[in-house]
Regions:
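Positively charged n-region of N-terminal signal peptides that target proteins for export
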Residues: 1-5
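Bacterial N-terminal signal peptides
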Residues: 7-16
């Protein structure tokens, strides 16, 4: 009976699969007929589209080769970008004229974008897999997921009456999603119906609209149309092949002094999780820089408004200059309050990619090497990385109670303070709250909940992490409960941050797609388990020396010492707040067994709290 039941179930499943496959082929056949698709592309074609992108006048030139080659150039009012895809491999010239070779998820997505362009120009061919078929939510459409060779799946919504695509949907890097809508279908010069209006609705950008200005069939394929991209002039100036930059560690973030357009140096956060560079919009007037365009960023938390800047020059110690840069702009006031130091912006891919970067955490030195002359002389652990829009990824393996070899596609995030933060979908899919959770109370950074970097996490311990030849054990980790931002996405498993990297001497070798780890004595020491005095602090005021208690954990040592939310710490052991930084205050609060005297302003009155610092493993407010 059991065998018969199994056979019946299997037969039903096979019948269902066959029916779905037949349905998809019928939908595709109707789609081809509706757009008058031809068996083979008649020739190479060239589109010119005009519209607006990030509130900027924009022209896109798109070339499609009959043999599958693809090229697209996007010219906005103040910047441009170009991609060439040949033989399944790609090149990308960014807004600074730097040419790179995409790989990993980014390459897969570019292959799918080129495939989508061919589908719209010539109709759907047979060179893809139909991964899924379902009915649209309103019942008037069918939804097909089409995946080309080496690409990722795009969802296409097909109208059941016209059999034309209504829209397509793709997931982008770090969980961003874009829906593209198609309208005004009419005949092209080569006979196929094409959409003359395209609307792009991106999850973290201003909606964009493009209309076809010209669609041309090219009789012959000019070699220049798909030639390799040529980089612009180098944007790096170095007085020698090696430069040494000092840095400080602020709340486990590397902060480097940088001069912007010749102005006095200010701290910039070093962040591999940033795809370009960023300027603090709140300080741009002091740099003499104006923004252009309009977009949004979400980072690990809430979405906030953003824009762009151009003609930016970054000056570093030891004679290093990065010139003629385009950057994003964003309000970094929240970062300043969290770190307690003035922040000019963020240094991401557009800085990191120009060098091989050596990080000596013990000496707090960053050594920049010329990638054309540098070669690795050591025997460290080499871990390969891939990139998605300039963000590096590892392929890690985890050991958890039910799976000793769980794969994890993780961001190599040197801008993250913690050890590992797992995304909410990865936590749910692998039952991590139950399997490795140590404190399931979800905590947020009180006072900064609406910032782009805001997170909502509970805590756990991973028994083992394997990163190439590196093995780390008993690692305290964060388990995200975010429903938005990067940690709310299921595109990657999580981020690995500074708590792990700072145990090593590190080389970031972007030109060779690798990060090298040299062991130090710290790498052999057990991880410190999470303990806290029970206070959350931010730095307020123009000088960032007004230290405000934003939360006190219930039943914590801080609560027992009579600290309260909204307290202002005006002095420590008789030293006024103007004489020390937020990092100094945090260091004192981590010195278990030390006696401290805090002067507190509460309700306009001063009072003293004398206490011995005790750390506990309870909730972190």
């Amino acid at each position: 009976m059991k065998a018969s039941l199994t056979a019946i179930v299997c037969a039903a499943l096979l019948s269902s699969v066959a029916a779905r496959a037949a349905d998809s082929q019928q939908i595709l056949a109707q789609w081809r007929a509706s757009v008058r698709a031809r068996a083979l592309p008649p020739s190479d074609v060239h589109f010119v589209r005009q519209g607006s992108d990030d509130s900027l006048p924009t022209v896109t030139d798109e070339w499609l080769g009959a043999d599958g080659d693809y090229r697209v150039r996007t010219d906005r009012k103040f910047d441009s970008d170009e991609i060439v895809l040949k033989g399944g491999q790609a090149q990308r010239r960014d807004w600074d004229g730097y040419v790179r070779v995409p790989n990993g998820d980014e390459l897969a997505r570019l292959r799918s974008e080129a495939f989508a362009a061919r589908v719209l120009a010539f109709g759907p061919s047979g060179e893809f897999a139909v991964r899924d078929i379902k009915a649209g939510a309103d019942g008037c459409c069918d939804v097909l997921t089409l995946t080309p060779p080496g690409g990722i799946g795009f969802e296409w919504t097909i109208d059941r009456k016209t059999h034309l695509p209504v829209s397509s949907y793709e997931l982008e890097g770090e969980g961003d999603a874009a829906t593209t809508k198609y309208a005004d279908w009419s005949a092209s010069p080569w006979g196929t119906l094409i959409p003359h209006r395209i609307d792009v609705i991106d999850s973290d950008r201003v909606p964009a609209t493009f209309t076809v200005q010209s669609a041309t069939s090219l009789e012959a394929k000019p070699d220049a149309d798909f030639a390799d991209l040529v980089a612009g002039p180098s944007d790096v100036r170095m007085t020698s092949d090696t430069a040494v930059l000092p840095f400080t560690m602020e709340a486990k973030h590397i902060v480097i002094p940088v001069s912007v357009n010749g102005h006095a140096p200010i701290g910039f956060i070093f962040d591999t999780g940033d795809e370009s560079e960023g300027l603090n919009a709140a300080r741009m007037s002091s740099f003499g820089i104006a923004s252009y365009g309009r977009t949004a960023i979400s980072g690990g938390g809430q979405q906030v408004q953003s824009a762009y800047a151009r003609d930016v020059e970054f000056g570093f110690t030891d004679g290093v200059v990065l010139a003629n840069q385009h950057t994003a702009t964003f309000d970094a006031t929240g970062l300043e309050r969290a770190l307690g130091v003035p922040i000019g912006g963020i240094l991401g891919y557009d800085f990191i990619s120009r060098f091989v970067i050596e990080i000596d955490y013990k000496k707090q030195l960053m050594i920049l090497h010329n990638p054309r002359t540098w070669s690795y002389p050591g025997t460290g652990a080499i871990v390969p990385i891939t990139f998605d829009d300039g963000i590096p990824y590892f392929e890690a393996r985890l050991s958890i109670p039910t799976n000793s070899d769980l794969p994890a596609h993780v961001v190599a995030d040197f801008g993250a303070a913690g050890s590992i933060t797992f995304t909410a979908p990865f936590v749910k899919a692998n039952n991590l709250l139950t399997l490795i959770g140590t404190n399931n109370t979800v905590t947020r950074y009180a006072g900064l909940e609406k910032e782009f970097f805001a997170q909502a996490n509970s805590r756990g311990v991973v028994p083992e992490l394997r990163l190439g030849p590196i093995v780390e054990r008993a690692i305290p980790v964060s388990l995200s409960a975010n429903t938005s931002g990067a940690y709310g996405t299921g595109q990657f498993a999580g981020t690995i941050g500074e708590t792990i990297y700072s145990r090593y001497h590190v080389y970031l070798d972007y030109p060779r797609n690798r990060i090298i780890f040299e062991s130090t004595p710290d790498a052999a020491t057990p991880f410190k388990q999470d303990k806290t005095f029970g206070l959350t602090l931010i730095a307020a005021g123009n000088d960032l020396h007004t230290f405000v208690v934003t939360a006190v954990a219930a039943n914590s040592p801080a609560a027992k010492a009579n600290f309260q939310a909204k307290d202002e710490i005006t002095a420590l052991d008789g030293v006024p707040a103007s004489k020390f930084a937020l990092s100094d205050l945090r260091n004192h609060l981590a010195r278990e067994g030390e006696s401290e005297t805090f002067t507190i302003k509460r309700g306009g009155k001063l009072t003293a709290i004398k206490t011995t610092i005790v750390l506990y493993g309870g909730n972190i407010p």
